[in-house]
Amino acid sequence: MPAVDILTELKARSIEGVMFHDKMREYFLYLGLHGYAAMHSFHETEERLGAEKLTDYFMAQNGSLIPDKALTAPDVIPAQWYRMRRQDTDAQWRRRAVRDGMTAWRDWEKSTAVLLKDIIFRLASENETTYSRIAEQKLSDVESEIAGVEEIIFDLESIEYNLPIIIEKQPDIEKKYLTKITFLMTPVCTLGI
């Protein structure tokens, strides 16, 4: 398989990741959990910048574009949520929604890791070392994200998804991730590096 076809898959998964995290941002905003929403805004920004890095490098090396692949936005938000107001939900429903959202996130990242391992193998088989390294870096980021979400799930399970505790932590989480987004978007030349 030509490397460009493999890179098309890699680019497509990155763009699907942007869409996934955008939907997760909406998901947690709907639940009134602004910290978790900011966390997904950060991951959305990371995914977008990763896709840009890949396409920019490919264009610089080959003078051409990585072809687009027809994509469908990941189905994250349950259909019934579009027909109801969040004020119509109770605490048990919201606890379950937090649990389901975190599980969906972990499952998404695990399926991304499986795909990336396959992409790395195929790129290495085509002797595309540089692109294989780009995919390996993305896999490392995804594995870190999996570890992070599993830690969040563990913490949430240990407090039995206690909403007052979850809500109390949101401002600190939001501040942390808004700072990370600012850092991601700051050009290197202004960082004094």
Language model regions located:
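Iron-associated oxidoreductase/ferritin-like identity signal
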Residues: 1-193
